Amino acid sequence: MTITTTTLTRAAGLSAVAAGVLFIGVQIKHPQLDADFVTTTEWTVRQSAKALMAVLSLVGITGMYLRQVRQTGVLGLLGYVVFGVGYLIIMSIELIAAVVLPAIVHSDPGYVMDVLAVATGGQAAGDIGLMQPLNLVAGFTYLGGGLLFGIALFRARVLARWAAALLAVGTLASAAIPLFPQINQRLFAIPTAVALIGLGYSLWREQRTRSTGTVAVTPLDPAGRK
């Protein structure tokens, strides 16, 4: 198998689609966040899936940006960098949640509950160290990066514009999460997830069309031609 830029870009598109599907999947029947849930296998599986979602999203937006560097300009670069940093931080937070929190929940349940409170837009009763600024920066970079990157993709007119607009609006709407109960907060993931699926499919299809269109066709000589 020959690895080409087209192959890599199509893979990035599929990564974005997978990220969107995972983002929706981890929200389905999500239990209430509390110390008891942290001790379960389901917690580890869900947090690991969220970390994988962040990695796939990063791969996906990287492919989207590289496909349209010139068209998105400075705004695209800024949006990609900020959004990418956001996903890197989200990945780190989810890995910490999957590995560290279950290990300390019995010895320091108060700390774990404070971390969970901050993760859902609430306030910590005690000191949670670097987890406080880490969650804060993750929130700002996710919201700001998604908005800027979505606008840049919309203006570039290369990928599906409806999905680009939905990415900008969906990520920005996440700022309202602290205003809703945990059960309703899960709904805010759907617009961004659908946007990733739409953009990823658009990137994959666009590369597939370009690849098919470059196949050279040599006309046959008419029968009996001398």
Where are these regions (language model features)?
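Hydrophobic, aromatic-enriched alpha-helical segments typical of multi-pass transmembrane helices
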Residues: 2-226
